[in-house]
Amino acid sequence: PLCWFNRQPSSSATGELDKDALNFNGNTYYVGFDANQGAELQGQMVLDYIKKNADTIDRNGDGVIGYVLAIGDIGHNDSIARTRGVRSALGTGVDADGGVDSTPAGTNVDGKAKVVQDATLDVDGKTYTIRELASQEMKNSAGATWDAATAGNAIGTWTASFGDQIDVVVSNNDGMGMSMFNAWAKDNKVP
């Protein structure tokens, strides 16, 4: 038997399921969860939180709800799905090859990055712009991805660049998210 555990066999470029690997023989199994379903839930939870707290979440009152995104591994199907899920739910996703682009945006202070777009959200008669201010793969100097320490450093860089424009912090996994929360978001009361 062949057992794929916690990572679906997938293309490192697109994140699409490798059906040949998954169906290698009659005793091939995948043990894990549906990455796309989890991604949709994550994106919807972020959107629901923004809608519920729209009157207080825009910290500087500029009408732009800015978020930063810690991307785990640009070639990992879970990371690709989670990035796409958040961008789809928030309306900031841009189509690339029939799916939402999961490429890191780098910095996007003016909303003109090619891999994301500004979105609008109407809540109780008020229109907000939703903007992905920055995103990057959390890869350390040794090449390890999903790196919590790199995420903690990234939030420091992002806050120095964007300050009170950051209204929401989003992460592809809990370790990176906790690092950003402990390094900055908790003290600044940013979800």
Task: Identify what each model region corresponds to.
Residues 1-191:
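A residue-level marker of the well-folded mature domains of exported/periplasmic proteins
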